[in-house]
């Protein structure tokens, strides 16, 4: 379904502001994007309980492992005056690629994987999103969604985006989900046992 009109107007206004630029990840520049991701993530998430800073090396390793399922034009970065400001990482739903494998990975499954990788996936999953504190409430997240939409709609492939897990303590992300017109899908409960 289309984004609400107000959301779209704000996002387009932000996307065209002077000094603001938006780039999708480029596989041949993974190290630079891993560095930008670390800078954004560590700033955006530092005040959350049990936060552990991410290192560029670890992010680069993760990006390299994600290459088999990654569509580089689903991972977007926002920059303000060339400073990394915001990021959204979205992947094609790997479950759709491997669900028929029944735990096997032979030649037939590898061929199926290649087919599903390019033609058979119609769902995306947002893995992580973050904006540096200094740039929160600038509408960058909205603009990232618009940039994503500009790529995804002409493909006529993806029909659903799951915005993944967002803690009920994260009011900012919950408000972004609401602004996009997202519908609630699942509620997960996390429990811990205290000894």
Briefly describe each language-model feature range.
Residues 123-131, 136-152, 179:
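Conserved acetyl-CoA-binding loop-helix of GNAT-fold acetyltransferases
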Residues 24-131:
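A conserved beta-strand-loop-helix scaffold within acyl/acetyltransferase catalytic domains
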Residues 176-187:
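Conserved acetyl-CoA-binding loop of GNAT-fold acetyltransferases
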Residues 131-136, 162-173:
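Conserved beta-strand-loop-alpha-helix junction that forms the acyl-donor binding cleft
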Residues 1-24, 189-195:
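Acyl-donor-binding surface of acyltransferase catalytic domains
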Residues 123-124, 152-167:
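Conserved GNAT acetyl-CoA-binding A-motif
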Residues 163, 187-189:
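Long, positively charged, glycine-interspersed low-complexity recognition regions
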Residues 1, 93-98, 135, 170-171:
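Flexible glycine/acidic-rich beta-alpha junction loops that bind and position SAM and/or redox cofactors
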């Amino acid at each position: 379904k289309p984004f609400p009109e107000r959301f779209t107007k704000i996002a387009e206004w932000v996307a065209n502001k002077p000094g603001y630029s938006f780039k999708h990840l480029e596989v041949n520049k993974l190290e630079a994007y891993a560095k930008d991701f670390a800078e954004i993530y560590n700033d955006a998430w530092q005040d959350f309980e049990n936060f552990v800073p991410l290192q560029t090396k670890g992010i680069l390793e993760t990006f390299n492992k994600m290459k088999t399922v990654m569509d580089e034009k689903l991972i977007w970065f926002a920059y303000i005056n060339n400073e990394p400001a915001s990021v959204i990482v979205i992947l094609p739903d790997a479950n759709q690629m491997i669900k028929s494998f029944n735990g096997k990975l032979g030649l037939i499954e590898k061929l199926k994987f290649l087919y599903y990788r390019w033609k058979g996936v119609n769902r995306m999953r947002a893995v992580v999103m973050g904006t540096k504190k200094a740039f929160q409430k600038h509408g960058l997240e909205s603009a990232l969604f618009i940039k994503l939409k500009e790529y995804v709609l002409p493909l006529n492939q993806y029909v659903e985006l799951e915005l993944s897990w967002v803690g009920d303590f994260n009011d900012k992300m919950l408000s972004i989900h609401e602004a996009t017109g997202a519908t609630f899908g699942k509620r997960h409960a996390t429990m811990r046992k205290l000894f």
